[in-house]
């Protein structure tokens, strides 16, 4: 269980897997009476009944009600930005998403176009293992012809400078995404990359996956002030918790149809214990 009881507990036993152990821990370590333990146990009961977990790492974060699977599925067509420095885990995260594409998206994906700047041998493994994926070097000149009216995903890896300066990229994100049924996924090294169309691309991005970036934590702070102007502390606490482990990340779900209660998540893949950060109102 991911919930911490209470915030300042340094005892590993504070992370409990059943109500009996949690109750004993609160009584013996935190010296809580039966009445004092009751709200913690009531809160924990929600988690043990459901396969989705919510992290309540700070006093201003509280548990959310059980989630419906469709609530946390990526809504296609959409635009996704995966951000972080070299070796942070962006490429691995993207590959894992594509390998679980049927479970991760709201629609059946028929074609994946994977565009890269530098060839890597693992691209051959992806073409062998992932159905209907096509690898292309460089930024494609005619994007729509590659999909032939199929429901698809355009992935751009190590093409930050090219993609943010191309008119065709803006057309895909602002018009093609909706009218051509194409989702875009692009990997960048900072949240606000330079480029002719970077601001337009950023404003039309529905999901931002932010990895740990020791040299650019200001970028997350700016994003927090833009998307959550009255809750920047909540966002930064969530981000710091999500990236505390190697290759950790925080998903900013900014899709218009997403519930306000589940906009910050981590560990989102089918074999993970998904975590949702919820603000105390």
For each of these PLM feature ranges, what is it?
Residues 57-74:
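Pre-Walker A adenine-sensing motif
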Residues 26-29, 38-46, 114, 191-193, ...:
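Short amphipathic alpha-helical segments embedded in low-complexity Lys/Glu-rich regions
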Residues 1-5, 17-48:
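C-terminal recognition-helix end and immediately following basic linker
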Residues 46-59:
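Intrinsically disordered, low-complexity regulatory regions of eukaryotic transcription factors
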Residues 66-68, 77-102, 106-113, 117-234:
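Conserved P-loop NTPase motor cores
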Residues 9-11, 59:
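Short cysteine-rich clusters marking metal-coordination/redox-active sites
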Residues 200-281:
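Conserved GTP-binding G-domain of TRAFAC-class P-loop NTPases and closely related GTPase folds
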């Amino acid at each position: 269980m991911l919930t911490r009881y209470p915030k300042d507990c340094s005892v590993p036993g504070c992370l409990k897997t059943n109500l009996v152990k949690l109750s004993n821990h609160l009584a013996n370590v935190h010296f809580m009476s039966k009445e004092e333990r009751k709200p913690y146990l009531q809160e924990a009961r929600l988690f043990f009944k459901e396969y989705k977990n919510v992290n309540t790492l700070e006093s201003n974060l509280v548990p959310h009600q059980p989630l419906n699977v469709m609530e946390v599925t990526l809504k296609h067509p959409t635009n996704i930005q995966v951000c972080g420095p070299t070796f942070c885990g962006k490429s691995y995260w993207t590959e894992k998403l594509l390998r679980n594409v049927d479970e991760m998206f709201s629609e059946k994906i028929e074609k994946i176009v994977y565009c890269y700047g530098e060839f890597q041998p693992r691209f051959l493994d992806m073409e062998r293992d992932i159905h209907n994926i096509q690898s292309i070097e460089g930024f494609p000149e005619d994007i729509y012809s590659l999909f032939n009216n199929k429901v698809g995903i355009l992935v751009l890896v190590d093409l930050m400078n090219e993609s943010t300066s191309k008119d065709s990229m803006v057309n895909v994100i602002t018009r093609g995404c909706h009218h051509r049924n194409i989702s875009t996924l692009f990997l960048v090294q900072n949240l606000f990359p330079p480029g002719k169309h970077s601001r337009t691309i950023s404003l039309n991005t529905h999901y931002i996956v932010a990895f740990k970036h020791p040299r650019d934590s200001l970028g997350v702070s700016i994003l927090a002030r833009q998307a959550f102007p009255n809750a920047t502390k909540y966002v930064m606490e969530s981000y710091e918790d999500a990236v505390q482990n190697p290759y950790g990340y925080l998903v900013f779900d900014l899709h218009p149809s997403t519930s306000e209660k589940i906009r910050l998540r981590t560990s989102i893949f089918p074999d993970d214990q998904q975590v949702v950060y919820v603000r105390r109102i």
